Amino acid sequence: MARGVILLAAGGTGGHLFPAEALAHELNGRGWTVHLATDDRAERFAGHFPAAAVHPIQSATMGSKNPIAVLGAFWKIWRGVRQASTIIGRIKPDAVVGFGGYPTLPPLYAATRRKVPTLIHEQNAVMGRANRALAGRVDAIAGGFLPQDTSAAGEKTVTTGNPVRPAVLEAAKTPYAASTGQEPFRLLVFGGSQGAQFFSDAMPGAIALLSDAQRKRLVITQQARADDVARVKTAYAALGVAVEVSPFFTDMAARMAAAHLVISRSGASTVSEIAVIGRPALLVPYPFALDHDQAANAAALAAAGGGEVHPQSTLSPERIAALIGGLMDNPERLAAMAAGAKSVGRPDAARLLADLTEAIASQKTVSDFKKGTQA
């Protein structure tokens, strides 16, 4: 017999849906029935989502400065609130959990009006706009990197971490082993759909500036946009470097576990996976990210000694070469960075998030939950 119903609200991007999916698996395993509220954009990601039902709900982004567009967005969101309220009345969830993005506004707002217990999960080190709008109304806030401080939001925040994929948990079992002497040095470079262009442009020139001995040690795995793959391969081939370049790697977690150094953007999922697996990283925040969330995520890992943060504007090929070459010649530093990253990894994030969800569903306060976890 099911313990009850939990409604998850996520949408817009797979980045918002992934932690929702991880929580759904955990809650299903505990006997809960899970429903998903999302928008049309995110429905394409939801094909394998472990939910009893998926409920498309209208929403809109509030990004325009055009007053007519703003009014239209408000009207769409309000219609979404009415849709969500009807669904909540029908399925009677014990709690509603949001994962950021504007599609979460209607279901979470409707839930607070109906006095249903509510929780939001923020993946980044700074709150996104939708979660900021909801923070004052919800009962609890779960954070990937958010602080538990004495502010109004901080007092009802529980730092659960960001749930990671099973493949990442498996990769985390591989301890870090520094490359010394003339051993191969495995370098993993990736930037995601928004950031790979910079690495495609900058990395081959930087590798060309390394010493011959250092280039001979390098084994590079680099993610690049499909349009860039051929030219990146050609540039590396001219240097005689062992490299694999592709737009996508299905075994990215295993490749991260095999890496001696990671160079990447600093989205919430990326930083969480680097921390759980425990690998040293040079983080280059995407400079055009909304709310500068990538810079804040990177700073959280750097504060633990797990990585170095380098703004893109400071990274000439000469600077990148100096950073890589210096670390290749300092395995002790790399091992210390790996340990620092591992120290802030949260492999139990899905369990902690499910624990908090159950507590909120049973009408417990965040204060009571924190006391219970510290007992």
Curated annotation (Swiss-Prot):
Main location class: membrane
EC number: 2.4.1.227
GO MF terms, alphabetically ordered: UDP-N-acetyl-D-glucosamine:N-acetylmuramoyl-L-alanyl-D-glutamyl-meso-2,6-diaminopimelyl-D-alanyl-D-alanine-diphosphoundecaprenol 4-beta-N-acetylglucosaminlytransferase activity; undecaprenyldiphospho-muramoylpentapeptide beta-N-acetylglucosaminyltransferase activity
Keyword Cell wall biogenesis/degradation applies: yes
Domain of life: Bacteria
GO biological process, one term: cell division
Pfam family, one: Glyco_transf_28
Biological function: Cell wall formation. Catalyzes the transfer of a GlcNAc subunit on undecaprenyl-pyrophosphoryl-MurNAc-pentapeptide (lipid intermediate I) to form undecaprenyl-pyrophosphoryl-MurNAc-(pentapeptide)GlcNAc (lipid intermediate II).
NCBIfam families attached to this UniProt entry: murG
Name of protein: UDP-N-acetylglucosamine--N-acetylmuramyl-(pentapeptide) pyrophosphoryl-undecaprenol N-acetylglucosamine transferase
Gene source species: Mesorhizobium japonicum (strain LMG 29417 / CECT 9101 / MAFF 303099) (Mesorhizobium loti (strain MAFF 303099))
Lineage: Bacteria, Pseudomonadati, Pseudomonadota, Alphaproteobacteria, Hyphomicrobiales
